[in-house]
Amino acid sequence: MVSKKNKIVAALLAFFFGGLGIHKFYLGRVGQGILYILFCWTGIPSIIAFIEFIIFLCGSEEGFDQKYNFYYFQQQSKA
């Protein structure tokens, strides 16, 4: 079963733990999360995560749901 991802939780994880890619693991993007961990020593993932933090906060709930909660709503429509 797929759980619904929360936009605010994703934004907070990106802000506080973004350099390690924790928000990517939360959103189900495991491959990207591993890349963040591999390159965390460069500081680049921290910069990208801060940009993603801003995008999460400024983006619409519908856009977030389309991108990260697609499978959740697909399962709900089948039930």
UniProtKB/Swiss-Prot annotation:
Annotated GO CC locations: plasma membrane
UniProt membrane topology term: Multi-pass membrane protein
One Pfam entry name: TM2
Entry keyword DNA repair: no
Subcellular location: Cell membrane
TM region(s), chain numbering: 8-28, 37-57
Keywords assigned: Cell membrane, Membrane, Transmembrane, Transmembrane helix
Protein name per Swiss-Prot or TrEMBL: Uncharacterized membrane protein YozV
Organism of origin: Bacillus subtilis (strain 168)
